[in-house]
């Protein structure tokens, strides 16, 4: 079983206390409680920049978690860590897996778009404008999906879509 950690951050301590109370009062199975504990410990480790520890906890949480909605957030967080580590192919894989279980994760679509946009910029630097355009088009598709789910968000993406004439807004 993972160790529960409390750091000096008041909000982290408070949310940890609330999570422990909820685990005791909400009717859940032993497996669900273990999965949540691993997920919580993964979030704590991730917030402290301990990505290896966070991944270990998230992988264990995915092994135990049976609810697709809850699994989607675990997979999304694994994608975040791979993005932070510059492992974009792995990150995209985990964002896709998260969206398979929960298609209403605009942040996953946004992060996928950011990766595609970055790859488009890299293709430009390598002198391959055709590949760059393909990456930018893919980024546009992902941003459109994120914006459709949360129209008031992703203003920079909306501006980029307008400037590049990839999407017209009303």
Curated annotation (Swiss-Prot):
It is found in: Plastid, Chloroplast thylakoid membrane. Its main location: plastid. GO terms for cellular component: chloroplast thylakoid membrane. The keyword Membrane applies. It is a peripheral membrane protein. InterPro entries: PSI_Ycf3_assembly, TPR-like_helical_dom_sf, TPR_rpt, Ycf3/AcsC/BcsC/TPR_MFPF. GO terms for biological process: photosynthesis. TPR repeats lie at residues 35-68, 72-105, 120-153. Keywords: Chloroplast, Membrane, Photosynthesis, Plastid, Repeat, Thylakoid, TPR repeat. Pfam families: TPR_1 (PF00515). HAMAP family: Ycf3 (MF_00439). Belongs to the Ycf3 family. Essential for the assembly of the photosystem I (PSI) complex. May act as a chaperone-like factor to guide the assembly of the PSI subunits. This is Photosystem I assembly protein Ycf3.
